[in-house]
Amino acid sequence: MGKIIAIANQKGGVGKTTTTVNLAASLGVLEKKVLLIDADPQANATSGLGIDVDAVEIGTYQVLEHTKTARETIIQTSSPNVDLIPAHIDLVAIEIELVDKDDREYMMKQAIRDLKDSYDYILIDCAPSLGLLTLNALTAADSVIIPIQCEYFALEGLGKLLNTIKSVQRIHNPDLDIEGMLLTMYDARLRLSNQVVEEVKKHFSDMVFDTIIQRNVRLGEAPSYGESIIKYDASSKGAINYLNMANELLKKNKEKV
């Protein structure tokens, strides 16, 4: 049975979507069957996998609305072993539509539970907020990965996210684990980057992945070509970092790599 992992941080610009797309692609290269669910109205994970967002007619919106089954919305991507439930800007309206429903936090869980037998990993790219979309993802997930950028204000809002996770564990999903914190946008030349790494490891030592994602020009270029870093430049630092991250995740979950 597959594992559902939400990639979440309400702070924007931390490498959340970059991590979701490239972790999915890396796991696919390592011959794991992966489904990426784009739960962010900005739909950057969708476009980052080469899908024309304007051409998306059904996706996460319909899944949460329960007007389409999750299986009906799945599309194949050009990344090996990676499927996608795409997003569109209309997803921004779903929180308003769900707000009056009694089981509003469970809509995604109900919709995707049957997919766990079809995939090794289901990755959910969360919106940069702690609204209903993110609550749905955390309620549906087995665990959560928290990307943290190695920059000023890196820990800002982290306490609020951890409190939200505790609240979800208490009320909606007692089995939710923190898979780990992933340090991103690291530049070894900068004192600040090194200070952030030290600070995060000091406070959350056993929760931090050993792999650190370095700042990399090619990593920033790949989304504009609708490609993962693995496909865009497999020899780049970014590709190597995310393949290392995928291997670390598999080892953590005691899978052969």
Question: Model features per residue range: what roles?
Answer:
Residues 1-257:
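P-loop NTP-binding core
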